[in-house]
Amino acid sequence: MQGHKQYKNTVSARIINIATLAVTLGISAILIAMATSRGLQKEIQNKTSVFNGHILITLFENNESQVSVLPFEDNDLVRQKIRENKNIKRFHSIALKAGMLKTNSHFEGVLFKGVSSNFDWSSLDAFLTDGKFPDLSNTISKEILISETLARQLDLKVGDQTDTYFQRQSNQGLPKKRRFTVAGIYFSGFPDIDQTLLYGDLRQIQKLNRWEKNMIGAYELFVKDFSLIQNTTDQIYNSIPSELNSIPIFDRFPSIL
């Protein structure tokens, strides 16, 4: 009888130990999954920010558009207001225009992101897989940075030239053609970016759209402390002209939260 009782106690202890271990492993698995999820979410947040900025300043009319429909003046007053904000790390001017890359046998729709000469290319160092970044230092550059996806689909490599077609602002007449040289190739790992986004000279878009040299599509801002982004966005909004809006990245890409 005593032996039977000891046996039961031993079995019960083992069951309890197994149950405790199972609970511990279950909690550990949940914590690991949560940590992995947070890590993945952080990576998505960081990558999305690198290619899109933390805060966008643009006209209200451009809010719902992926392209720069209407330009505004790049002026010292707005730039000064941006610089005065202590959470702003850096910023630059951009404009976005839809187009089509075409080779002899293939074509792909693209989003041409024109950036100003002070664009910080080092932010894309980790994504550059071949070649170099476009040189925007002097005259209007004909160099572009494209993704591995576009390079593969269009059978392009560094040094190749490719024609790009852009719809006229009036939507009348034949598209405008520009020939660019592939300076570099990047890979973000995000299909939404790699499938369409290429980088080039902001002045190309100004010329294509017949904008004045001081007209831009948006300012792209990067912050020092991401946790203060909403507060920073509000501060910027209250300091810039009323026709301009400031938009935090999570309003444009809600999935990164």
Language-model segments: what does each one mean?
Residues 1-27:
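N-terminal Sec/SRP start-transfer signal
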Residues 22, 37, 41, 253-257:
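Alpha-helical membrane-interface segments at transmembrane helix boundaries
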Residues 30-111, 135-139:
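Hydrophobic, regular-secondary-structure patches
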Residues 50-52, 105-110, 139-141, 157-159, ...:
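Extracytoplasmic
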Residues 56-58, 92, 109-114, 143-145, ...:
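Soluble periplasmic/extracytoplasmic beta-strand elements of cell-envelope proteins
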Residues 95-138, 182, 199-202:
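The feature marks short, hydrophobic/small-residue-biased sequence motifs that occur predominantly
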Residues 121, 148-195:
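Mid-to-C-terminal secondary-structure elements
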Residues 174-257:
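Mechanotransmission and gating elements of multispan inner-membrane complexes involved in transport
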